Amino acid sequence: MTVIERFLKFVSFDTTSSETSGQQPSTPNQKVLGGELVRQMLALGICDAHMDDAGYVYGTIPANCAKYLPVYGLIAHMDTSPDAPGGPIHARITEAYDGGDIVLNEAQGIVLSPRDYASLQKHVGKRLIVTDGTTLLGADDKAGVAEILSAAEKLLTSDRPHGTVKIAFTPDEEIGEGADRFDVTGFGADYAYTVDGGAIGELEYENFNAASASVEITGLSIHPGSAYGKMVNASLVAMEFAALLPALETPYFTDGYEGFFHLTGMEGEVEHAKLSYIIRDHDREKFEARKAVMEKAAQEMDRRYGKGTVTLNVRDSYFNMREKIEPCMFLVEQAKSAMLELGIMPKVQPIRGGTDGARLSFEGLPCPNLCAGGENFHGRFEYVPVEDMEKITELLATIIWNIAK
């Protein structure tokens, strides 16, 4: 199978993860896809390919040379984001892109346009895999899954020397649980790369420090005709709480190394309201300061409306892996070198998000992130260029081959 054939097969599985199921993996189709991956790995000759009870898929490509080499891992995730419908996905491949609009769904008037997504202009002349405008595509991260398996095929069918390579495919990365039950010791790699980035050339070893915050607000209901000086409307208190946070420090207004507060959910009535936030910043001190701002806002609401009005729960999710990667920057340099060898321009940049590798780096497995090729993740305008997936497959194999030189 080609990398494109693999990818189109994998996106036919709806593997949307769920934050509310309480299961592991969070949705059953992730294990269905995992079974398919194990079958393909066994067919390639990866004899120890298996899936554990939690839905993690593992396998080993043995070294084909006597030289002592560190063991490297390649990791991608099987789930897709719950932010957009995950199926049924009707993917199609365009002809060579001409730089104009791409009609995704004529009946619904859904168009992928360079006026809205300027990155399309980089791909003139390439074939693009797109959706029908009703679902996401799943290049995040099934492009990475397909590229790893296709690179594995290259390694297994070539006489070029390489060391031992470990492969892992994780569930539930999109809901922040991809590393929860990852068996770092059993995986047995010294170093690894996640293949979970965006456009070709992206190479990342910095990510957000991340936390989630739940704001529970208790109000007091009374008949509005006699509510003077008595009613505490929890929904209005929620609005006041939100107004105390910096208005220009949301995802819409921030970029690069700038952090943010992101309101991800809200519900409310008079007696009870709830706000759900995620907090992000690359700088650890600024990250801690953001959490302190949330605490101060909660205290102010209690001052205005009485102690116990607001219950704030903040939970750290993951931290910036930079401090774990900097002692082994050769991981970044050897990826850059392989890119340049293949005519890919490296783009080293911070991740405005997180990866499984961020958490794994803190568990003793340094794990920077490589491009998977897709763009516009988590939405119906997601796409991935065919030629870039083919080149990234070559990149993964080249990194492994170069380590053995």
Protein language model regions, located:
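Midchain, well-structured core segments that form catalytic/ion-binding scaffolds
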Residues: I102, Y117, K126-A139, D172-E295, ...
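Active-site-adjacent substrate-binding region
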Residues: L236-F253, F260-H262, T309, F319-P368
